[in-house]
């Protein structure tokens, strides 16, 4: 059986609110956004910084319920600045024969990181949202 690594979900254009160099590595995300993106606590995620062009892998930890904070912790805090726009992506392994039917989930947030929309990924669709920290 052959598997492919496929995009499972992403939180699109979240705004970094904090960067905490002194905290152990991770990215803090509200439980509401984690649930919407089907990301578990301690699950590996890729973070792509739209503003700075940097990329890194870390793991998600659960923030406070109702919070709109996106906090990059540990050494990765060097790669972001509060106000940066990021994409937070999770991946899964899928049997090759199931890949054609796979639809990743995209979680859109507003400029304050509040949940705006959840939908399957659509190739070629653009959704520009300004970031106001």
Swiss-Prot record:
Protein keywords: Autocatalytic cleavage, Cytoplasm, Decarboxylase, Lyase, Pantothenate biosynthesis, Pyruvate, Schiff base, Zymogen
Binding site for substrate: 58, 74-76
Active site positions: 26, 59
EC number: 4.1.1.11
Residues bearing the modification Pyruvic acid (Ser): 26
Broad class of enzyme this protein falls into: lyase
Pathway field: Cofactor biosynthesis; (R)-pantothenate biosynthesis; beta-alanine from L-aspartate: step 1/1
Obligatory cofactor(s): pyruvate
MF terms in GO: aspartate 1-decarboxylase activity
Principal subcellular localisation of the protein: cytoplasm
Reactions it catalyzes: L-aspartate + H(+) = beta-alanine + CO2
Cofactor: how bound: Binds 1 pyruvoyl group covalently per subunit.
Modification after translation, per record: Is synthesized initially as an inactive proenzyme, which is activated by self-cleavage at a specific serine bond to produce a beta-subunit with a hydroxyl group at its C-terminus and an alpha-subunit with a pyruvoyl group at its N-terminus.
Pfam families: Asp_decarbox
Protein location: Cytoplasm
Subunit text: Heterooctamer of four alpha and four beta subunits.
NCBIfam families: panD
HAMAP family, A to Z: PanD
UniProt function note: Catalyzes the pyruvoyl-dependent decarboxylation of aspartate to produce beta-alanine.
Protein name as catalogued: Aspartate 1-decarboxylase
Naturally occurring in which organism (per UniProt): Legionella pneumophila (strain Lens)
Taxonomic lineage of the native organism: Bacteria, Pseudomonadati, Pseudomonadota, Gammaproteobacteria, Legionellales
Recorded name of the encoding gene: panD
């Amino acid at each position: 059986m052959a598997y492919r690594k496929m995009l499972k979900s992403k939180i699109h254009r979240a705004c970094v609110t904090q960067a905490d160099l002194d905290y152990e590595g991770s990215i803090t995300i509200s439980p509401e956004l984690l649930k919407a993106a089907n990301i578990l606590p301690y699950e590996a995620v890729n973070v792509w910084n739209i503003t700075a062009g940097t990329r890194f892998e870390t793991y998600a930890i659960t923030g406070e319920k109702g919070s709109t904070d996106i906090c990059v912790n540990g050494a990765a805090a060097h790669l972001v600045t509060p106000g940066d726009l990021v994409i937070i992506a999770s991946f899964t392994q899928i049997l090759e024969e199931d890949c054609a039917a796979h639809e990743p989930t995209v979680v859109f947030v507003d400029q304050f990181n509040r949940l705006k929309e959840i939908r399957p990924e659509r190739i070629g669709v653009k959704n520009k949202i300004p970031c106001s920290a």
